[in-house]
Amino acid sequence: MYKEPFQPTYEYALECDKHDELKDFQTEFYKKEGTIYLDGNSLGLLSKRAEKSLLTLLDSWKEYGIDGWTEGEHPWFFLSEKLGELTAPLIGALPEETIVTGSTTTNIHQVIATFYEPKGIRTKILADELTFPSDIYALQSQIRLKGLDPDEHLVRVKSRDGRTLSEDDIIQAMTDDIALILLPSVLYRSGQILDMKRLTAEAHKRGIHIGFDLCHSIGSIPHHFKEWDVDFAIWCNYKYLNAGPGGVAGLYVNKKHFNRPPGLSGWFSSRKDKQFDMEHTLTAADHAGAYQIGTPHVLSTAPLIGSLEIFKDAGIERLREKSLHITRYMLNLIDHELKDFGFTIGNPFEDEKRGGHIYLEHAEAARICKALKANGVIPDFRAPNGVRLAPVALYNTYEEVWQSVMILKKIMKDEEYKQFENKREVVA
């Protein structure tokens, strides 16, 4: 259990660390000495187990050559399905409904090509104006491929405050001309969690298929897809799941849709026992593997093997418990220490609406992020004025949170940020 109630002292942070049930996992990760890493919502840290599984698959290539597809500790031919099974508990899905494959954007193209069937008056896709740009680019592309105009057929729900979305507004936008819905589970800037259960139920009442982009929720919050009856989902594995830069992504398709042919077919859509028959008629797999396209990217998949072992040991419910407590602690500390320095807290305070990161707004956000980095704290800048800070349950400590807020306070008090330009780097 975590120490209550909140106190702004250094001693309180140490007490919270002492009572942290997940503290033993911190030694699993490579943490640079003298650095406080608060960017795990953008790229998670390397774990020793992920490193080991990557080296194991490199060794299997070295030892087996082509036979690595079927030999060794982790045969490559079955790896996507195996890791899909291990991922399924994180989203509350059946093992056969989950596959590890492709990238987030290619998987968006796959699910939209599979589920978007404009007919009659139902020709539009419903999204939102705060979602990640790649989702919008893919949706626009898929609409054009149907010979339609994205300006007319892509509906984006407006935000009332520029940070969050109202579920009531989303439901109101589920009109008779909507053919498909794709929404984020957690908004990438503000960290707001959308009520996926409610939105799915409302979409289904209207006969609309609905899916979610889980990039900022998987590995951070529990999901219950079997209960919620979500139609499809996609995600990356390199944020909270620590699969490494450019690591393989994931895809979920509700089993009730397994009779739906993949919109984008490829060799690895095949049933495994038929794949090497080399027929020109596809015999699709009878599970989520049917929605793979090409050959698995084995080496970018390898770190996920070790990472998912850690998640199995830690448990997503325990991770969420700590995440809620440490983000609430950070919010309280920011409110206590930084209220005179022009920051606006942009993420929800309510536990049920708050994802795994803190979102601060400030007119000098870009240069503040640079000053934090110069002081050994790794944040994340999001244009135009956002600072994201992610105290990750697996490897961040309460002491690090306390130290980072005190460093930020000193930066603001001494105006250290003014020595930097207030514009983002090429990679923010």
Curated annotation (Swiss-Prot):
Cofactors: pyridoxal 5'-phosphate
Keyword set, alphabetical order: Hydrolase, Pyridine nucleotide biosynthesis, Pyridoxal phosphate
Pathway where it operates: Amino-acid degradation; L-kynurenine degradation; L-alanine and anthranilate from L-kynurenine: step 1/1; Cofactor biosynthesis; NAD(+) biosynthesis; quinolinate from L-kynurenine: step 2/3
Protein known as: Kynureninase
Catalytic activity: L-kynurenine + H2O = anthranilate + L-alanine + H(+); 3-hydroxy-L-kynurenine + H2O = 3-hydroxyanthranilate + L-alanine + H(+)
Family as reported in the entry's similarity comment: Belongs to the kynureninase family.
GO biological process: anthranilate metabolic process; L-kynurenine catabolic process; L-tryptophan catabolic process to kynurenine; NAD biosynthetic process; quinolinate biosynthetic process
Modified residue annotations for N6-(pyridoxal phosphate)lysine: K239
Listed GO CC annotations: cytoplasm
SUPFAM superfamilies in the cross-refs: PLP-dependent transferases
Highest taxon of source: Bacteria
Gene3D superfamilies according to UniProt: Aspartate Aminotransferase, domain 1, Type I PLP-dependent aspartate aminotransferase-like (Major domain)
Enzyme class: hydrolase
Quaternary data: Homodimer.
Positions that bind pyridoxal 5'-phosphate: T104, T105, F132, P133, S134, D135, D213, H216, Y238, W267, T295
Function: Catalyzes the cleavage of L-kynurenine (L-Kyn) and L-3-hydroxykynurenine (L-3OHKyn) into anthranilic acid (AA) and 3-hydroxyanthranilic acid (3-OHAA), respectively.
Molecular functions (GO terms): kynureninase activity; pyridoxal phosphate binding
Disulfide cysteine pairs (residue numbers): none
Enzyme Commission (EC) number: 3.7.1.3
One Pfam family linked to the record: KYNU_C
